[in-house]
UniProtKB/Swiss-Prot annotation:
It comes from Pyrococcus abyssi (strain GE5 / Orsay). CDD domains: Ribosomal_L22. This protein binds specifically to 23S rRNA. It makes multiple contacts with different domains of the 23S rRNA in the assembled 50S subunit and ribosome. The globular domain of the protein is located near the polypeptide exit tunnel on the outside of the subunit, while an extended beta-hairpin is found that lines the wall of the exit tunnel in the center of the 70S ribosome. The gene is rpl22. InterPro entries: Ribosomal_uL22 (IPR001063), Ribosomal_uL22_CS (IPR018260), Ribosomal_uL22_euk/arc (IPR005721), Ribosomal_uL22_sf (IPR036394). GO terms for molecular function: rRNA binding; structural constituent of ribosome. The keyword rRNA-binding applies. This is Large ribosomal subunit protein uL22.
Length: 155
């Protein structure tokens, strides 16, 4: 059995909302925070198109917090940014899962808005490389938890 977890989103209404989560994803927590910030509030179809553009290296993700030594990207008034392809692929899977959960509930997939998306640090996968004179060099891998809540917008 898997570990029990709770969503950080409060006031979940099962009639109008659907949710999904990705646990222990082997992606950068810092870049996941930046991508989630960019997707929050978007319509789900627009968010999926945006992630496709990031994966194809057509649109960069602006870096607001973790942007030390990052170059500016092309575009009018665009500051520091990157193309986090691995993060975009992982978050796209979670968004598609949320879309399928909404379809299963009978919600219209074209009217879904991302009202909550968050990235949290997961457990660290500890590893090490053997080095000279019997010393180990640690090589740890960060994991990330992603959670998404979508809501059907009434127009």
């Amino acid at each position: 059995m898997g570990r029990r977890f709770d969503y950080s989103f409060q006031n979940f209404d099962p009639e109008r909302m659907a949710r999904a989560s990705g646990r222990d994803l082997r992606i950068s927590p810092k870049l996941a925070v930046e991508v989630c910030r960019e997707l929050r509030g978007m319509m789900l179809n627009d968010a999926l198109r945006y992630l496709d553009d990031v994966i194809a290296l057509r649109r960069p993700v602006p870096l607001k917090r973790y942007n030390d030594s990052q170059g500016h990207k092309p575009g009018k008034g665009f500051g520091p940014g990157r193309y986090p392809v691995k993060v975009a692929k992982a978050i796209k899977k979670v968004l598609l899962n949320a879309q399928n959960n909404a379809k299963q509930k009978g919600l219209d997939p074209d009217k879904l808005r991302i009202i909550h998306i968050a990235a949290h640090r997961g457990p660290v996968l500890r590893g090490w490389y053997p080095r000279a004179f019997g010393r180990p060099t640690p090589f740890n891998e960060q994991t990330t938890h992603i959670e998404v809540v979508v809501e059907e917008v009434r127009r």
